[in-house]
UniProtKB/Swiss-Prot annotation:
This is Heat shock protein homolog SSE2. PROSITE patterns: HSP70_2, HSP70_3. Has a calcium-dependent calmodulin-binding activity. Present with 6300 molecules/cell in log phase SD medium. The gene is SSE2. GO terms for molecular function: adenyl-nucleotide exchange factor activity; ATP binding; ATP-dependent protein folding chaperone; calmodulin binding. Residues 680-693 have a biased composition (Acidic residues). Induction: By upshift to 37 degrees Celsius.
């Protein structure tokens, strides 16, 4: 049975959660952290995913890819490319399909990977983290993504999950997942017939700022309005600090970290830590050793100075809140509580700015780092056929209006806005078209100007075949079932022709009609389904051939990583065996090997050690195993003698202990017999004395 898995794919760190044991648990990674760095690194032989990638990032900046969620679906000529490019230390390149790829050095060769591939690598990593921690299979996942993700980006992230061997049961907006956490675990919500509780939920993470206005009742939640600033997050604060020190160090130390990616990245990492320290302290020191040209740098920053540096950002705090309220047709006076999540909301001046806009104190009912992942895990559990979860109904809204267009075959409209902006989903609509033959349809965004820059206006295309128009008619009605599914994807479920038929329906008899009255009928025209049309869809999803090809490539890379890890384990085991066996030959094994055996084994150890640090430094798993077994063939004989002697000693000790124990028991029994005998003699003497009397 698959364990429901919720993934909050963060831009800086990701959080993993599962539904189990009648609750939702956050999964810790291999170093017991409750979040995992969202990055992929590439080395001479293998990949560095998550924690290992973060560890090697400073020395491997050009081959470490961060900001994965920002380049999903991003086109190389997108107006926002330059904004994103400045946050990358790796080289971004243009793929054949016009999207952004990343060029890295891997295994001694230059490789280019798509954003979908890179994201799949990371998802595969965290999938195995969850499997190892839960000791269960993981097949279903609910992925939390930014609200501004377009249809194309949602398809791309779903493909990444499939490449990683997962079934994406739902793509959910991250603030919606957090709201599900709130609604499911909050016990004091209004009842079904009561006025709903209105919550303003503000999420500011590493790269995005989102505000959502939501209505809660017990067992249900509805999103009323959502707005965002997709270029406002913790990384912008980090960069402001880094740029400040870049200018300062240029004057103070005559170095320009902007010309040295490794140095800039080290200052950026230190700036992130400084930002966190200033959330709890009014001032903090700043220092980085040997940042470049063997120069150590040091400085300090106060909270007041930080607030001055980020003043341009703080001026943008108001917009997402006021826009979300406008969508919801509410004012700040209608808001009952303001909940904040996301690591960046810990910055004091930012919290104050949010509170000032709402005119209310802020609440931290939700875990700021884990609420999204827990909500996603609960949503995944809802889709599980084997788990029973607490009933909870929720509706999200699509910020973009979507229309459907079709071939104009009769004198009729050829376009219809089906899902207006901010309409709730999931939702299904049925439309009727008059068709003269086979036709095609498209789903498009109604107002391209309201989309994020660079977003494709076309969502999907469909071709329909099998339209048969009766000879006595000019056209035939076709019913088309349109749907915005739970993941916010606009699809067509089916299409079919209809025809009108005449049927006889009974007419109800008067109440005073005799029992043997003849039943009356009337002719009624009914519309029935006639022919289901053939349908071919063209979406942003990978086709089966492309998907299988990428799955095979990921499997190859995973197996390669596994082989490298196992090879390193065998190498370390061989090295440890050499040191351990050499030490024991002069110690506990000394009396159990002849001089000839010692000399032979020591020579073997020396030869193997020289090989290990020479030609064998980069050898194969099989070779390390063979070398280990070669040493063990003699070492185990000596070890066996030692263990046999130790066992003999243990047996002798155990026998002595048993003998001593039996002697103690015998002595105690003898003592008891002597005591009873003495007691009997005393009684006999007393009897004799009584006779004399």
């Amino acid at each position: 049975m698959s364990t429901p898995f919720g993934l909050d794919l963060g831009n800086n760190n990701s959080v993993l959660a599962v539904a189990r044991n009648r609750g939702i648990d956050v999964v810790v990674n291999e170093v017991s952290n409750r979040s995992t760095p969202s990055l992929v690194g590439f080395g001479p032989r293998n990949r560095y995913l998550g924690e290992s990638g973060k560890t090697k990032q400073t020395s491997n900046v050009k081959n470490t890819v961060e900001n994965l969620k920002r380049i999903i679906g991003l086109k190389f000529k997108d107006p926002e490319f330059d904004i994103e490019n400045k946050f990358f230390t790796s080289k971004l390149v243009q793929l054949k399909n016009g999207k952004v790829g990343v060029e890295v050095e891997f295994g001694g060769k230059t490789h280019v990977f798509s954003a979908t591939q890179l994201t799949a690598m990371f998802i595969d990593k965290v999938k195995h983290t969850v499997q190892e921690e839960t000791k269960s299979s993981i097949t279903d996942v609910c992925l939390a993504v930014p609200v501004w993700y377009s249809e194309e980006q949602r398809y791309n992230i779903a493909d990444a999950a499939r490449i990683a061997g997962l079934n994406p049961v739902r793509i959910v907006n991250d603030v919606t997942a957090a709201a599900v956490s709130y609604g499911v675990f909050k016990n004091d919500l209004p009842g079904p017939e009561e006025k709903p509780r209105i919550i303003g939920l503000v999420d500011i993470g590493h790269s995005t700022y989102t505000c959502s206005i939501m209505a809660f009742r017990k067992g249900e939640m509805k999103v009323l309005g959502t707005a965002y600033d997709k270029h406002f997050g913790g990384r912008d604060f980090d960069r402001a600090i880094t740029e400040h020190f870049a200018d300062q160090f240029k004057d103070k130390y005559k170095i320009d970290i902007r010309k040295n990616p490794k140095a800039y990245n080290r200052i950026l990492i230190a700036a992130e830590k400084l930002k966190k320290v200033l959330s709890a302290n009014t001032t903090a020191p700043f220092s980085v050793e040997s940042v470049m040209d063997d120069i150590d740098v040091s400085s300090q920053l106060s909270r007041e100075e930080l607030e001055e540096l980020v003043e341009p950002l703080l001026k943008r705090v108001t917009y997402p809140i006021t826009n979300a309220l406008a969508q919801a047709k509410l004012t700040v006076n209608d808001i009952d509580f303001v909940e904040i999540i996301g690591g960046t909301t810990r910055i004091p001046v930012l919290k104050k700015s949010i509170s000032d806009v709402f005119g209310k104190p802020l609440s931290s009912t939700l875990n700021q780092d884990e609420a999204v992942a827990k909500g996603a895990a609960f949503i995944c559990a809802i889709h599980s056929p084997t788990l029973r979860v607490r009933p909870f109904k929720f509706e999200d809204i699509d910020p973009y209006s979507v229309s459907y267009t079709w071939d104009k075959q009769v004198d009729d409209e050829d376009r219809l806005e089906v899902f207006p902006a901010n309409s709730s989903y999931p939702s299904t609509k049925l439309i009727t078209l008059h068709r003269t033959g086979d036709f095609s349809m498209k789903a498009v965004y109604t107002h391209p100007s309201k989309l994020p820059k660079g977003t494709s206006t076309t969502i999907a295309k469909w071709s329909f075949t099998g339209v048969k128009v009766p000879k006595d008619q000019d056209f035939i009605p076709v019913k088309v079932k349109l749907r915005c599914d739970p993941s916010g994807l606009h699809i067509i479920e089916n299409a079919y022709t209809t025809e009108d038929i005449t049927v006889q329906e009974p007419v109800p008899l008067p109440e005073d009609a005799p029992e043997d009255a003849e039943p009356q009928f009337k002719e009624v025209t009914k519309t029935i389904k006639k022919d289901v049309l053939g349908m071919t869809a063209k979406t942003f999803a990978l086709n089966p051939v492309e998907l299988n090809d990428l799955i095979e490539k990921e499997n190859e890379l995973r197996n390669q990583d596994k082989l490298v890890a196992e090879t390193e384990d065998r190498k370390n085991a061989l090295e440890e065996y050499i040191y351990t066996l050499r030490a024991k030959l002069d110690d506990e094994y000394s009396d159990f090997a002849s001089d000839a055996e010692k000399e032979k084994l020591k020579n073997m150890l020396a030869t193997t050690e020289n090989w290990l640090y020479g030609d064998g430094d980069d050898s194969t798993k099989a070779k390390y195993i063979a070398k280990y077994e070669e040493l063990a063939s003699l070492g185990n004989i000596i070890r066996g003698r030692y263990l046999a002697k130790e066992e003999e000693k243990r047996q002798a000790l155990r026998a002595n202990q048993e003998t001593s124990k039996m002697n103690d028991i015998a002595e105690k029994l003898a003592e008891q017999r002597r005591a009873r005998a003495a007691s009997d003699d005393s009684d006999d003497n007393n009897d004799e004395n009584m006779d004399l009397d």
